[in-house]
Amino acid sequence: MKLGSAIPWALLFSTATLISTGWGLDYHACGGRLTDDYGTIFTYKGPKTECVWTLQVDPKYKLLVSIPTLNLTCGKEYVEILEGAPGSKSLGKFCEGLSILNRGSSGMTVKYKRDSGHPASPYEIIFLRDSQG
């Protein structure tokens, strides 16, 4: 990784630390349109089995998305990241591990889906406007 590309990742990790320690906006609801410069989506524990969050920042900036906490039951639940609005190309479905995504876009969609009757497992999804645009 070149130094120029390492800077946004360092900013993401340092900002993720700030957000997870009380700086930032926390979302626990199932889905919605989020237009803040940064925030954290936490495990939704309600009755709905599918949640869709549309993330959008000013078009002159890019979004960085990090999934530092993801311990889902593979085969029964997943988080999917789309490169734009709902219905856009999928960047992947994730059920465990650490994932960091930067697609050069000002909008992304995050979808959480689980089987009916299966309890929600813990996840944390951090989004952040890239200050370097």
Curated annotation (Swiss-Prot):
> Primary place of residence?
secreted
The job of this chain, per UniProt, is described as: Not yet identified, major porcine seminal plasma protein. Can bind soybean trypsin inhibitor after deglycosylation.
Which GO terms of type biological process are on file?
A: single fertilization
Give the subcellular location.
Secreted
> Where do glycans attach?
71
- Which region is the signal sequence? 1-24
Record's PROSITE patterns?
A: CUB, SPERMADHESIN_1, SPERMADHESIN_2
Q: How does it assemble?
A: Monomer or heterodimer with PSP-II (depending on the type of glycosylation of PSP-I).
> According to its UniProt record, what is one Pfam family this protein matches?
CUB
Limits of the CUB domain? 30-130
Key word Mitochondrion present? no
Sequence similarity: Belongs to the spermadhesin family.
Amino-acid biosynthesis as UniProt keyword: no
> Which residue pairs form cystines in this protein?
30-51, 74-95
- A GO CC term assigned to this protein in UniProt: extracellular region
Q: Which tissues express it? A: Seminal plasma or sperm.
Name assigned to this protein = Major seminal plasma glycoprotein PSP-I
Q: Keywords in alphabetical order, please.
A: Disulfide bond, Glycoprotein, Secreted, Signal
